[in-house]
């Protein structure tokens, strides 16, 4: 397990293209949009992923700071190389979400934003840009299972929550898969 305060997976919004990319503030020439994440440190990310690639058994990176829920596949060569780790990104508990910040700038809102993210980032297996919540991990020697629990309201006391997704990764295979791992 590797903990990272910020998201390690490359996030390409430039490739989202057209009006979506422009409305999100994308710039041309390959400049990164999200330079406060690992995207701003591509050489360092490549070195770390290279180290993870040399360790047998795969790895799982836990990250945050995007205020949304993501499951990504990490690979060397800016995502074009062999898979070396999965990444589980936790949502915000109460801070404004990724969708709240960006979806109003996109015609069609959240659903168009999430489709554009997935289209431009094939290494992103799942994303929910709008929900608040938390991630609950179940870790054994053979697998890690993550359950994203989301809440519909913040700012008002309630114990209502819902299971939004379950993703897992098993020892020896760095690719995340949808659903619980077999014990």
Predicted regions and their residues:
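Long, structured stretches of catalytic cores involved in phosphate-ester chemistry, encompassing
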Residues: 1-183
